[in-house]
């Protein structure tokens, strides 16, 4: 299934993160902290400014990003995999 985000929305596939406790025990499931890094798999056209111009999204497909995983981030299933739909404002950095 294809997905096309609207406006300044970005679709991100979260990178899995193996977490270990201070004692070296591997944490899984709800005990493990979710990664806030992922790969951009789709981007919207951009945000419409007050003057009517469209400001393109600053990230592109394939970018690895660090994002804010809080209020406003929507989780969906796409072809059996979990993806995140978030606003460009929720992206904090691009990993280079």
From Swiss-Prot:
The family this protein is said to belong to: Belongs to the GroES chaperonin family.
GO MF annotation terms: ATP binding; metal ion binding; protein folding chaperone; protein-folding chaperone binding; unfolded protein binding
Q: Where in the cell does this protein reside? A: Cytoplasm
Q: What does this protein do?
A: Together with the chaperonin GroEL, plays an essential role in assisting protein folding. The GroEL-GroES system forms a nano-cage that allows encapsulation of the non-native substrate proteins and provides a physical environment optimized to promote and accelerate protein folding. GroES binds to the apical surface of the GroEL ring, thereby capping the opening of the GroEL channel.
User: Under the cellular component aspect of Gene Ontology, which terms does the record hold?
Assistant: cytoplasm
- What do we know about how this protein assembles, alone or with others? Heptamer of 7 subunits arranged in a ring. Interacts with the chaperonin GroEL.
Alphabetically, which GO biological process terms does the record hold?
chaperone cofactor-dependent protein refolding
The record's section on InterPro entries has:
Chaperonin_GroES (IPR020818), Chaperonin_GroES_sf (IPR037124), Chaprnonin_Cpn10_CS (IPR018369), GroES-like_sf (IPR011032)
According to its UniProt record, what is one Pfam family this protein matches? Cpn10
**UniProt organism field:** Pseudoalteromonas atlantica (strain T6c / ATCC BAA-1087)
Q: Which UniProt keywords apply?
A: Chaperone, Cytoplasm
What is the protein's given name? Co-chaperonin GroES
Q: Which gene encodes it?
A: groES
Predominant subcellular localization, coarse grouping: cytoplasm
Q: List the disulfide bonds.
A: none
